[in-house]
């Protein structure tokens, strides 16, 4: 051992069972303020004995490492592990991993490297998946690279409980988690809402993608659009200890070229300062006929990691331009059977255009006041602008009308432009202390979001007839394009308190908390600027969870959580027009069991029920929350490394979804629109034994049929998609090079995707090639 000299430390209560050393170090990080850095191969095959008692953090570390031959050096709360060298000294670290011990750190990758051992849960901090009473999955940058993911949608589809409601090349991306919609506007970045593009999130800025299944309002506050099925948080890149200079060139069909640079460097004493820059230039033909898609993106991340102080800042700018984007269509009420989907490269409305610009800045500061008290504050600001040449289906007289049974429709052109300005903040304190034999982790937090949004809608007069199989270019748009004016102003604030109690040597973990939410919404006339309506409301969102570990590798868990969605202002077509409905709550009950099979495979079985009020009119045409959508489900997941070099990601979800408490029994017991009864995923990634550096991968995605309406008279067929890929890692002229090739929708399957009552044709067979060079 070669520790640096430290000041006398106060002992803390430590209870860590015998288990693999990596898991034991994660628990040590969560019970103390130590940040532990190490290379993956340092811990290979190492196990830790059980330790307990009132120990200083360093003494606890010594006991865990006893007999392993692993050395450590310490600077403040930063600890670096290394293997002893037979000739003396230590072995240099190759790839550094950080335990998820305190705020701001990333959990180490799990076996196989595609997912992480834990992730952030907002107010509850960073937790190992085996220690949290929720169902989560945390994707690593390795997976993003190897699958050649382009946007966030390409990542989250790896889990059967998550489905994309839109296809690539559209005007935006929306998701579904546990049968409920989650929009791109409800994705958080580094724990803050409202700071990523409301249309699509490019993966080039991402280090991790963290998915929570089930309502997440307690963790980070109300999402801007009130999603309740789950929560998605993305984590931006930071510089590693090893310098990085990577250039990637990519190609995607039909002829879309991407160039990316990824630079990272740490410097200063103990590599305390880090800088990470990513730049992307993309352009060329998209997967749609006569389509073009471009992206210009730059992202700069700076961070400082000191003994007690940690700070980070990000600046992100992206500009997207899509000529002929993939659109959605609706169906006339008389349609009882959908026509066959057209080819995947057909755009229903030739001549559409989308341009989008987003700029974001954000910063986060964390400080350890003592070994057992940490505070943080984070803030960010985003401006977004969107300009669209947008089609509208009408009848020959110009009145709104959808597509008929044979795919015929009439279309006029509109301009729909919008802007948004968002300020977002988060602050909190986390304290650790004991009451007798019970350990507490108490978190106090506050969240704030203000979002101003504006729009302008200009309608043309020319109308042309068209068909989904042989679309006609949309006509000329209006002669005047209006400037977007303020339409709404939303402020969401909340205060939360939570306590996680540990009993019986951390074999029982109990979490309880409550968040008080305040909602303020004002609407404005975009012509006069006058305030037309508004409301103020508040509500409390409690949470409860328990984890019981009968064995060190088995976690039995249960939770109760609530989602909260801001209320709506009743429209003019109802008897109670102008009435303000209170924010409504969605309730989840969940239980499950997680098993970590010798650190190689983790499996999860989860049972859940989510009930959400449904807004509709009663027999007197009074609008309110009179019905309920209830989703009851079973989830099975497994991920990790089956054998050395064979990686697995498999999952299945079964949802019994029905409408209950409906006014007058209308549609009572029916299946809600857009919710599949079953979904399946199977992904394998294999390092071939006959060619060093060559890996093959494949993925199957199955989604059952769904209804397009609550009356269950119009059904959308299910689909199965197959993807294949390969990569080859080698060295050329002393430089590490990785070649990748992927094919999505290998069979060129034609199928519909549904988002609410609208559908779009899925992208056809798509080829992707890339080469990455590390200088």
Kindly give the residue locations of the regions a language model identified.
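Structural signature of Gram-negative outer-membrane beta-barrels, strongest in the C-terminal barrel
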Residues: 303, 420, 439-451, 486-612, ...
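Surface-exposed extracellular loop regions of Gram-negative outer-membrane beta-barrel proteins
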Residues: 321-333, 450-455, 547-590, 602-625, ...
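Conserved C-terminal beta-signal and adjacent last beta-strands/turns
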Residues: 442, 558, 589, 673-775
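Gram-negative outer-membrane beta-barrel transporters
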Residues: 609-611, 625-710
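Outer-membrane beta-barrel translocator/receptor signature
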Residues: 204-207, 217-298, 304-310, 359, ...
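Acidic, small-polar-rich N-terminal luminal/periplasmic segments of exported/outer-membrane proteins
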Residues: 30, 35, 94-242, 591
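Acidic/polar loop-and-plug regions of large Gram-negative outer-membrane beta-barrel proteins
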Residues: 282-286, 299-366, 383-420, 463-492
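Membrane-embedded beta-barrel scaffold of Gram-negative outer-membrane proteins
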Residues: 366-368, 374-380, 384-392, 557, ...
């Amino acid at each position: 051992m070669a520790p640096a000299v430290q000041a006398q430390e106060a002992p803390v209560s430590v209870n860590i069972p015998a288990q693999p050393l990596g898991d034991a170090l994660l628990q040590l990080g969560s019970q103390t303020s130590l940040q532990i850095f190490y290379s993956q191969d340092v811990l290979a095959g190492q196990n830790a004995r059980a330790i307990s008692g009132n120990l200083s953090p360093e003494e606890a570390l010594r006991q865990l490492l006893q007999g392993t031959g692993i050395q450590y050096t310490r600077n403040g709360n930063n600890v670096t592990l290394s293997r002893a060298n037979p000739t003396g000294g230590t072995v240099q670290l190759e790839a550094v991993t950080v335990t998820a011990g305190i705020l701001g750190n990333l959990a180490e990758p799990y076996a196989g490297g595609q997912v992480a051992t834990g992730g952030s849960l907002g107010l509850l901090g960073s937790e190992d998946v085996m220690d949290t009473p929720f169902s989560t999955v945390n994707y690593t940058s390795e997976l993003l690279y190897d699958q050649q993911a382009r946007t966030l949608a390409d990542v989250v589809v790896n889990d059967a409980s998550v489905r994309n409601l839109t296809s690539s090349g559209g005007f935006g991306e929306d998701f579904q988690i546990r049968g409920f919609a989650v929009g791109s506007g409800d994705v958080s970045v580094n724990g803050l809402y409202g700071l990523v593009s409301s249309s699509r999130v490019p993966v080039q800025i991402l280090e991790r993608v963290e998915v929570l299944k089930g309502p997440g309002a307690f963790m980070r506050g109300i999402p801007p659009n009130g999603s309740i099925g789950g929560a998605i948080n993305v984590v931006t890149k930071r510089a590693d200890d090893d310098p990085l200079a990577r250039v990637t060139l990519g190609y995607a069909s039909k002829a879309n070229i991407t160039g990316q640079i990824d630079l990272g460097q740490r410097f200063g004493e103990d590599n305390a300062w880090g800088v990470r820059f990513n730049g992307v230039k993309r352009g060329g033909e998209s997967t749609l006929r006569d389509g073009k898609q471009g992206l210009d993106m730059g992202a700069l991340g700076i961070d400082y990691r000191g003994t007690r102080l940690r700070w980070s800042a990000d600046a992100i700018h992206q500009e997207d331009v899509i000529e002929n984007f993939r659109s959605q269509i609706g169906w006339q009420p008389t349609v009882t059977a959908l026509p066959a989907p057209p080819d995947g490269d057909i755009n229903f409305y030739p001549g559409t255009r989308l341009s989008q610009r987003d700029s974001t800045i954000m910063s986060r500061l964390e400080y350890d006041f003592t070994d057992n008290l940490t505070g943080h504050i984070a803030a960010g600001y985003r401006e977004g602008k969107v300009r669209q040449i947008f089609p509208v289906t009408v009848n020959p007289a110009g009145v709104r009308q959808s597509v008929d049974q044979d795919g015929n429709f009439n279309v006029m052109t509109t301009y729909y432009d919008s802007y948004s300005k968002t300020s977002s903040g988060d602050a909190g304190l986390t304290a650790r202390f004991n009451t007798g034999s019970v350990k507490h982790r108490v978190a106090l937090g506050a969240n704030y979001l203000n979002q101003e949004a504006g729009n302008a809608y200009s309608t043309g007069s020319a109308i042309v007839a068209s068909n989904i199989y042989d679309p006609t270019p949309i006509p000329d748009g209006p002669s005047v394009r209006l400037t977007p004016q303020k339409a709404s102003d939303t402020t969401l604030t909340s205060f939360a308190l939570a306590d996680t109690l540990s009993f019986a040597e951390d074999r029982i973990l109990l979490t309880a908390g409550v968040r008080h939410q305040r909602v303020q919404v004002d609407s404005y006339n975009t012509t006069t600027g006058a305030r037309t309506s508004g409301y103020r409301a508040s509500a409390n969102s409690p949470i409860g969870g328990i984890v019981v570990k009968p064995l060190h590798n088995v976690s039995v868990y249960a939770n109760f959580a609530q989602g909260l969605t801001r209320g709506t202002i009743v429209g003019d077509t109802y008897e109670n027009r102008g009435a303000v409905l209170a924010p409504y709550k969605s309730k989840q009950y969940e239980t499950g069991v997680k098993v970590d099979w010798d650190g190689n495979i983790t499996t999860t079985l989860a049972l859940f029920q989510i009930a959400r009020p449904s807004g509709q009119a009663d027999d007197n045409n009074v609008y309110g929350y009179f019905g309920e959508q209830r989703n009851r489900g079973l989830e099975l997941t497994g991920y990790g490394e089956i054998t050395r070099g064979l990686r697995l990601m498999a999952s299945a979800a079964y949802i019994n979804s029905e409408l209950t408490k409906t006014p007058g029994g209308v549609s009572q017991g029916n299946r809600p629109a857009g919710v599949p009864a079953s979904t399946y995923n199977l992904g394998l990634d294999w390092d071939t034994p006959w060619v060093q550096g060559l890996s093959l991968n494949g993925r199957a995605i199955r989604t059952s049929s769904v209804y397009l309406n609550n009356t269950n008279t119009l059904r959308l067929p299910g689909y199965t998609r197959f993807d294949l890929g390969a990569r080859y890692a080698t060295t050329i002229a002393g430089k590490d090079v990785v070649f990748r090739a992927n094919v999505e929708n290998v069979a060129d399957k034609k199928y519909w995707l549904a988002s609410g009552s609208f559908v779009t044709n899925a992208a056809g067979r798509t080829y992707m090639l890339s080469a990455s060079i590390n200088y």
